[in-house]
Amino acid sequence: MAPSWKFKFDGRILFIGYGSVSRCTLPLIERHFDMPLSRVTVVDAEDRSIDIAPFTAKGVSYVVEPIFRKNMAAVLARYVGPGDLILNLSVEVSSIDVMAWCQKNRVLYLDTCVEPWANYYDNPKIPEEERTNYFLRYSAKEKAKKWGERATSALVTHGANPGLISHFVKEALLEIAKRKKVKAAKPRSREEWAALAKRVGTKVIHVAEHDLQIANRPKRSGEFVNTWSIPGFTGEGAQPAELGWGSHEKRLPKDGNRAQGGAEMRHLSRSARLHDPGPLLDAHRRADDGLPHHPWRGDHAGRLPDGLGEGPRGLPAHGALRLSPRQ
């Protein structure tokens, strides 16, 4: 069914990467943007021309050209300029460096995670704490402080989850308030959302996703099947483990340490206890990127468990937590 509205966009759009996320996003651009597809370019590190053929037939330009630190500026300048948009949906292309280029050239920017250059997550020369999502996220925020209030918009880590799920969480808080008969106007600030979360008794937010993908070979009993980006998933699995820790939780777990030291084991070697049986803890931006939005700063504000404090290089911890290996 055709959408009832379309967003008119007069600029050009550059996709970096044509992996699993881009393949889902490009149809949305076609459906919801009022613009010719001839103004859309996809730059990819691998040749996926067969996969993207239905869109190149409609006018999308497809270029196979890996982006590295040394050629990044030249490649980007070839396809976009002031008023255009970059969708960085790749792996191993630095989000922070691309954002910095976008600021200099007045180009809009959006990505689904703060991605580093290649060979970062498993580089033993880089301290563990600097390989966490927490560190990458706040490094991007520190960089953005230099841009000022009139900077070109850059929306970071805003895909489906994290991203769209943040809007679902807000709707859920309003629905819980309605069911609990808590009278509250729709919050208009972080502080008001935090106050509403406290009023309705929110302590833990468990995001459960129902994957509707169907494979041509049924999943076997006890088999794990990855249904999204293989490079993205393996990259997450190589990162240190981290959790968001609530101010209502007065003690650290047995092998938990504060954020500034980084984690001492990889995500996919850390088990976690959830409603679902037998999970392993995987790196995910949702573990820390919602924390600054929902802290309660009223009564008992700032009384985090012993061991939680400043994050890496003095960045605010917001309850970020690292996990040490089991003995």
Question: What is the predicted function of each stretch?
Answer:
Residues 1-11:
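A short, basic/flexible loop-to-alpha-helix module at the beginning of a structural domain
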Residues 126-201:
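Adenosine-phosphate binding glycine-rich loop
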Residues 93-107, 112-151:
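Rossmann-fold NAD(P)-binding glycine/threonine-rich loop
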Residues 12-27:
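Glycine-rich adenosine-cofactor-binding loop
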Residues 56-70:
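Rossmann-fold cofactor-recognition segment
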Residues 67-79:
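Conserved Rossmann-fold cofactor-binding substructure of NAD(P)-dependent oxidoreductases
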